[in-house]
A protein has these predicted regions:
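Periplasmic peptidoglycan-binding/tethering modules of Gram-negative envelope proteins
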Residues: 365-454, 525-526
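Short, glycine-/small- and polar/acidic-enriched structural segments
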Residues: 31-196, 202-203, 225-228, 250
Length: 526
């Protein structure tokens, strides 16, 4: 071989090697993970605002086994993230306080949790995305099988007093630091006949344990708060589902929280993470069967149980999440949730600036993608377009019921009236104080689903004067309340009912002015 050919051979070798390395790099960028070992190097939170580098960004997200978080655990979603140069590690951390501590200490970048836990635990971060609302997945179940007279919250006092007379106390069970506990707090603050202090509280690790305790004939459990698929099983076995998250569809909201560290060092990563997540959600909205299959596989559930779980979860699209963040809806939910926590001693102070707790900045790209998709499908599939826009279930009109239908509907319980619905002496004219009380009640009633909950306004008088006059006055007062609530925008089926002085408060004289009262009773209609 002549020495003249050696430089040419050497140059050819360099070109071949360069093409090989370049080809492998390009293949790895287009199809991450196709060639083992090439994508194994990760760098947590590299400096800069873009993931367009050869370093892969490693994100750690903390959550639990809730089916609403199954997308974050799915291989399909994690593979999609890798195409953006993001490697996601999902870890279960069931202790909510530890979950936030790890975020604050830099051991995690993101956390998924409920809005109430976000307010309670106060992480060093902000809400950057909304995941879902539970719409039936969580429920309060009464042990009607053991206590046949226990069919609504109105029956609690009698059952509790009977147990005490026999030297026993009744129990209540739920999974602590979960939506089940928050739903119990909602009962405690919203309904006058329910008081957590009346029960021996048994907090368990999982709803499956609460469900077992409710069924155990040797336990004196009167109430359990559980989630699907146990809610469906309880209903099928004759227990009373007195209130579910479907009745209060905005009470339990799951959120994505980004650490302040991630917000400051890698804002672009958050946008790309959310863009990939909501793209997956949009796909699931178009074809719900793949999400059901994902939930079944993730939770090792049967197809029917997975369907029950999915039926109770309403996932946010990016467009809807953005609308919540920018229209004031999320601010109102924060205020309402904080009020429940404060009233039950779980929060010392309601946030003064709730708008500072979240940002819509990082969801903008994902929302624009969803809006583009809505425009594309609107003409051919308006129902899908509505669902992608965040309407869907919410746009169904309220079914109008007759007075007799509302009156015959099974009771849930009486709302806690903070203040007095007062009238002029001997008249049906509301006082300013009475109007103020009703204005507060408008907000309370609007928390409940018009599709599943109706309202009975029941007027009572004290025993002074003739029965007929008192009957007429109580009916007139109840009707005035109904008219006032309707005038303030209440869309629920609502009816007025006068009782005169026929149902005095137990334990006080029928002539006592305290009998002059107005009950706001919620009943189940659907």
């Amino acid at each position: 071989m002549s020495k003249r050919t050696e430089p040419a051979l050497f140059l050819a070798f360099l070109i071949t090697a360069g093409l090989s390395v370049g080809g492998l790099w390009l293949l790895n960028r287009v199809s991450p993970g196709l060639i083992p070992g090439l994508s194994s190097q990760t760098a947590p939170l590299a400096d800069g605002n873009s993931t367009n580098s050869q370093q892969k960004i490693q994100l750690t997200i903390l959550g639990d086994t809730f089916s609403g978080y199954s997308t974050f655990r799915s291989a399909t979603f994690q593979d999609a993230l890798k195409e953006s140069g993001i490697s996601l590690r999902y870890e279960d951390e069931f202790d909510q306080a530890k979950r936030v501590t790890r975020l604050n200490q830099g051991q995690a970048d993101l956390v998924v949790t409920t809005l109430d836990q976000f307010l309670k635990q106060k992480p060093a971060g902000k809400i950057v995305g909304l995941i879902d609302r539970t719409v039936g997945a969580d429920a309060v179940v009464l042990n009607t099988r053991k206590y046949p007279s226990l069919k609504s919250l109105l029956d609690l006092n009698q059952v509790v007093n009977q147990a005490r007379a026999n030297g026993r106390s009744l129990g209540m069970t739920f999974a602590g630091d979960t939506p089940s506990e928050y739903l119990a707090l909602v009962l405690d603050t919203k309904f006058e006949a329910f008081n957590l202090q009346d029960f021996e509280i048994n907090k368990v690790e999982d709803a499956s344990e609460a469900w077992k305790q409710l069924q155990d004939p040797n336990q004196n459990v009167a109430i359990a708060v559980i989630w699907e698929p146990f809610v469906t099983q309880a209903r099928q076995q004759g227990y009373t589902v007195v209130l579910s998250s479907k009745d209060a569809p905005e009470a339990i909201v799951d959120v994505v929280i980004a650490s302040n560290r991630l917000l400051q060092s890698q804002p672009q990563v958050i946008s790309e993470f959310l863009e990939a997540y909501y793209r997956r959600i949009d796909s699931n909205v178009r074809d719900g069967s793949q999400l059901q299959a994902q939930i079944a596989e993730d939770g090792k559930l049967s197809a029917s149980d997975a369907a029950a779980v999915l039926q109770g979860i309403d996932f946010f699209t990016a467009a809807e999440a953005q609308e919540w963040m920018t229209s004031g809806t999320l601010t109102r939910r924060i205020n309402s949730t904080a009020a429940v926590l404060a009233l039950t001693g779980r929060l010392n102070q309601v946030p003064q600036k709730p708008e500072a707790l979240f940002t819509s900045q990082f969801i903008a790209r994902a929302a624009n993608n969803t809006k583009t998709l809505v425009d594309l499908v609107r003409a051919d599939n308006p129902a899908l377009a509505d669902r992608l826009s965040g309407k869907g279930r919410a746009i169904a009109p309220t079914q109008k019921l007759t007075v007799s239908q509302v009156k015959a509907a099974p009771a849930i319980g009486n709302l806690q009236v903070r203040g007095e619905v007062s009238f002029g002496v001997g008249s049906a004219d509301l006082t300013p104080a009475g109007e103020k009380t009703l204005n507060q009640l408008v907000q309370e009633i609007n928390e409940f689903n018009t599709q599943t909950v109706a309202v009975r306004v029941i007027g009572h008088t004290s025993r002074t004067g003739s029965a007929s006059i008192n009957q007429t006055l109580s009916q007139q007062r109840a009707q005035v309340v109904v008219n006032y609530l309707r005038g303030k925008g209440i869309q629920h089926n609502i009816m007025a009912e006068g009782k005169g002085f026929n149902e005095p408060i137990p334990g006080i004289s029928p002539e006592n002015p305290r009998n002059q009262r107005t009950e706001i009773r919620l009943v189940r209609i659907n």
